[in-house]
Amino acid sequence: MSETIDNPTVEEYNEKETVVSGEQVEQVEQVEQENEQVSQSFQISIKTPAEIGTINIQVQPTDTLIDIQSFLYETSETCLYSSFEFRLYGKQIPEYSELSSIEGLVEGATLEMVPVDYNERSAKLHVKRLRDIMNTGLTEFANMNNPSLFTSFSFPEKSNILTEEQQLEEQKQKFEQQQQQQQQTEDKEEKETIATEQQQNKKNKHHNKKGNKKNNGDESLNNENNEEKLTPQQKERKQKMTEIKGIDKPMLSSYYPESPIAPVQCVKSMIYSGWSPVPGYRKLFGDLFYLDITLLEGTTICVTASTQGFFINQSSNATFNPSVSPKATINHSLHQLLTQVSRLFRRGLNQILTNIGRNHPFDMLPGVLPVHNWVASSKTNRYDINKGTDTFVSVQDVELRGNPRDWNEEIQAPKELPKSTVQERIIRDRAISKVNSEFVECAIRGAQVIVDKAILPINPAENQRSHMFLYNNIFFSYALDTRDSFTDCGGDDAARTSANNDLKGIRLYNLADIDGLYTLGTAIVDYKGQRIIAQSLIPGILTTEKTSKIYYGSMDTPTNEEEEQQQKEENEENKNNNTKSIKADPEFHSRLLQAASLLHLSESKVISEDTNQEVSVCTSFESKGIIGIDGRRYILDLIKATPRDPNYTETKDQLSVLRPEAIATYSEYFKVTWLNQKRQQKLKEKEERQKKEGIDPPTATARDEDVQLTEEDLAQSPVVSFNPNLFSKVKLGGTPEEQQKDIEDLKAIGAFLKGILIPRLIEDLMLFNVAPVDGQTLTQVMHVRGINMRYLGYIAKNESANVPFIQDLLFNEMVSRAAKHCFNRLLRSTNASDMAHSISHFLNCFLGTETGSVSADEKSKKAKQIKSSAINELTQGKLWSEIAQLVSSKFDFEIPTHSVPMESRLIVLRCICLKMGIQILAKDYNFTTDAPFSPEDIVDLFPIVKHVNPRSTDGLDLLEAGKTFFNQRKYELATELLGEALAIYHQVHGPIHPDAGACFTHLAMLAYQNEQYDLAIEYQKNALVITEKTAGLDHHETVQAYTTLAVFCQRSGRYNESIGYMKHVLYLTDLLGGEYNPERASIYTAIAAILEDTERFDLALEFLKQTLKHQEFLFTPDHLMCSTTYHKMAIVCARATNFDDSIIHQKKSTDILEKELGEAHPRTKESLEFYTGLSQTANQIKLFKQHQALKAEQDELARLQKEKADQFKKSQPRVSAMPPSLENGSVSELLNYINGKPKKSQSKKSKSTNTTTTTNTTTATTSKSKITMAKTPNPTTKATTSKSSATASSAATNKSTTKTNPTSSSAADSSKPNKKSSKN
């Protein structure tokens, strides 16, 4: 994480916006105006030798041909072409030229890729390029160094929900198609004969019908058509990705998904031939080297790489015949040659390129530095002879065999470039970023070979702890207390801390960016327990000439090994005088004062003990200023670039310094407080003046608005600055009053830290305004607020933070940090052959459970296999005693237990692996055993690197301004600023950078707010892949990116795609989120919403119940969050027509609102109206079901009576004459006639009534029930017209109830004749 000075937001201090926003707006407007002048993109064409032909690309004037070349390398169609040059109108263009400087390169111009001759280096790079691309078909991921799992969880769909603009556009297209068809029909009618016209009209009519049917059905049958187009493998993958069965226990063995792409092989082998190197006489023919390639068909060919290209020669293993074979002609590219002679190679290469093209465009791009994951899939080592020969033929370290790079000159030269305009700053920042990434990459390689003892030190005669190294012109040293400088504050551990503080100081001074003041290129690499410091060399620092002596600061206690030679000379001169000699060169002092004003450091006086005179300095006395033989002024040893922490003033805490974020926040707070006091003072003076004049005092609001501060008042606001030499070993100068004031000022910020910043953090944690889920996010949250990690114990002991989730989080982080120190000490004393045993044994002691299942004989047998005694001496009890002691000394906190809680062990395992660079196998570890880990589970050990991490200041300004306008809902302006920031980041850092990912994230949110869902999804996919590559596959920001993408897909109707992403989010959240992680509730709610949209109501209800369970634990059962969840559960039950449960859930939601907000609150009223509507709907449905049951009973009775009557007819064949009046009579009349009883006379009125009633409707109970139904008012009408809440869920419920209205009304209407007959 890069550490910069973060100012407080407007929300934190309401007065800030009126104080500083004007200056910020002016800066942003200036940057924007300059950026518009230089970033006017234009389109050019590239004529390629590939089958794709000419392609069009959008470029910036500041781009170079190298940038275009990199783009072509990353495009699947042109990635195999490596040796070419660009020509414009037949004229060659230098590859480092900026596009703006190329004459004739304007909008629409065409650059031509022209093949050029090879040399040995370019030909070997071409072969390596082809080999790397072929290897992607055999590896698990396309980019193994920076993998992205996005493609594995992505099943892209088309949006089913169209925005208003898309609907209008679709209607417009349909209208134009109809007009075009009509015009075509009229043209045909004019040319053809009448008979032909009639026949053609029929065809046109039939064709138009089909076309209209097809167009009308496109929207409804879209998903079905897409489903039919899927192959069986795609259908199976889709079902596997989108299937959610419930909340299952996640397994670490399922961390990596199965690759949907089968391995693809192009050739059996491709190695350098034994006929290499080329004989002298063949060099005269242009031969460079020879390759032996075994094709998949089984044949082996020998290929010559020449300056003109590649061709097959006639050599074999026994004979050398370099002449051209008749099998194939010479080709400029190797893949073209192999395509001619091998059909299987052509098929395999096309498949690989197709697979690459299907991946996300950013998938193949490397990051600035690789991010190693802590989990590795089980994979076997593939036999590849090229990997063995790469050590000898690789061109990656060619600089080691030639002149080494002058890193200091490369790092300092870009800082001297002009920076008056945005274009100049972009060029400058890009050069700084590029050389820093190359320096760090080389530093990592150097640190690894040093720890592995593969190179010799430059001082082999001295103690091993004092060894120094030079690798590729980079100076390396161990971060150890080799001269007993830190014996009072921790020894070697303090030396590690001082190296880290020095790097932070370099970052600050680079951020200040003072002309004429330089810092060294620096990187810190932690590898196998050792901390290695890598620095660029100051010219002359290691020579015996006195050309680089100290001009500023103290000369007696150097902490970097670089000054050892010079220090020895200084000590020779003052060997009998053990005093602190402090210098302050005026030129140095004037430049450091500029930096000090930006860093809130005051000019202070210290006593130089050799002269006993006061010296004015504006840095810590330990810092040193050196003038190299190149004439540049370098500032070194910035271990106290910020003042001491006044809350930790003991000698053992002398390296405890304040964070720059805390200083910036306090400075702003102090300024706002002073301005408020100034305003109150003016207000008081005005009231006194009005009182004397007899004017009535205005209201409080009018008074506040009436008092305005002038620019002169703002200019008089005090500037906070601190003495960096307080609580240090140096003797302070100045008067006692000045010293006391400096101490009081410093103690004020200490009180501010403990009294405001930390309580505000605890409050936000309790209210879940911030919800760190692991040590990474907790560290980030605390650092951004200016709180050091040494305050973890102070926060944990605070009664306000006594929440299980927060306590578990703090405990895990403190224990992990203490365990890291124990781990480093163990690794430093471990032999290289025992490294896997050491790591697994430590993890077993740290996270295993001591059950006694391992016998003493087994332990003795394992101990004999290990040479390092430190491993055998380590036990679980001894380790946890050491961890408890470290937690007590570092965090002033006594841990309650000597073990990690079982539910947190996987979380802590991930934490310790990330801190130490350990990579373990993805398998399910049983933490209830003594030894859950074995040496075979340790896959790799990676170096952990910290570096300067330069960032573009212009891009940061535009990004922050875009965020501000986004929060103010000024979306158009925010989109413009964020787009410009993204363009700058692409030019400076490339697309794979955290800041570029932040731009894509905010652009996605802007597109989503503007209902441009497809665009929002594309932006968010870019942000997601960048986050995976820069933060990690399971980082909290990665989980948030997946969640946001799933929400966007849900809103656009891509439900299957959304479920695929949310399924992965659910896995990571349950795997690494802790037992009651607050993020779980929101994740479960989001999944429930998607399941509700896909009408999987039972599963949605299950997730909502889990949400409610977590919320009741984190908050209380009567919390408003629980009320919201109950309401969502009511909606889901209502949509599933389970109205009884829906009413119960909504009643609970309403009760909570009445208790927390009161009956008069609008939310309570809406909830009550919704509850009333649900009750009315449930009653209506209940009555309707009763009526349906009654009707079914009547129909059944009528059917039985009819059957009896039919049977009776069959049994009376002699009855041949029946009066017509009985043919339609009732059953009773029919029985009377059969029995010979006389028929009763009836009036016409009663006859008509009897014929209209149902045959079997005779009981009074039935008539009564029908009368009751007829009198019942229609509750749905009331629910429809009532002013209930306008939520989408209640609307869905109303839809389900209105479907029953026609049936209910018809049932009521059918009861009307019975009502009339009953009256009669």
Swiss-Prot record:
Low complexity: compositionally biased ranges: 1248-1311
Localization terms from the record: Cytoplasm
Entry protein name: Clustered mitochondria protein homolog
Listed HAMAP family: CLU (MF_03013)
Domain of life: Eukaryota
Organism listed in the record: Dictyostelium discoideum
Function: mRNA-binding protein involved in proper cytoplasmic distribution of mitochondria.
GO molecular function, one term: mRNA binding
Ranges occupied by TPR repeats: 955-988, 997-1030, 1039-1072, 1081-1114, 1123-1156
GO (cellular component) term, any one: cytoplasm
PANTHER family given in the database record: CLUSTERED MITOCHONDRIA PROTEIN HOMOLOG, EUKARYOTIC TRANSLATION INITIATION FACTOR 3 SUBUNIT EIF-3
Chain spans, region Disordered: 166-241, 552-582, 683-708, 1204-1320
